Amino acid sequence: DFANDRIIPDCVRAAASGKDIIVRNPHSTRPYQLVLEPLAVYLTIAMKQYEDRTFEGYYNVGPDDKDCVTTGTLADLFCAAWGQGQTWENRWMGGPHEANFLKLDCSKIKHTFGWTPRYGVKEAVEKTVEWSKEYLEGADMTEVMDRQIREFFIS
């Protein structure tokens, strides 16, 4: 995801250009997770639903409560993972109202499948920074993604 006004892509762009990260609302809480978390469990859900129709329905996939952090905390984790003295600043310039707290209720998937996230928010940010740096350095991204997928499934 390289879209504007997304915290991690904004962090990567700022860090890659040697600028401070601009955080619009450091006190808002969001359910941040590594993209591999929902993708992996969606495949499990699809397989289970294919095998047994009693599993049909919707499921929320999100981080554990302890990993629902503020945007400021996420920016801190990003800066620590990026290194090189990366910093962020709080700069709200108006704009549309944003909910201060967003969280997913993942109790159904946890109860039904015994699912728990493989990575906490710190590991998720570290893996995202690792991927981003390798992308910016022109690495073979197929190899990078294959390695990260293997690491994810053996964690």
Describe the predicted segments one by one:
Residues 2-6, 30-36, 66-69, 97, ...:
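Residue-level signal for the nucleotide or nucleotide-sugar donor/cofactor binding architecture
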Residues 121-155:
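Amphipathic terminal alpha-helices
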Residues 38-42, 61, 71-74, 109, ...:
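Non-catalytic, hydrophobic alpha-helical segments
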Residues 1-47, 74-81:
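NAD(P)-dependent short-chain dehydrogenase/reductase
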Residues 20-24, 30, 42, 51-66, ...:
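A recurrent short beta-strand within the Rossmann-like NAD(P)-dependent oxidoreductase core
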Residues 46-50, 82, 132-136:
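Short, hydrophobic alpha-helical segments
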Residues 56-60, 72-75, 83-101, 144-151:
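C-terminal "lid/loop" region of Rossmann-like NAD(P)-dependent oxidoreductases
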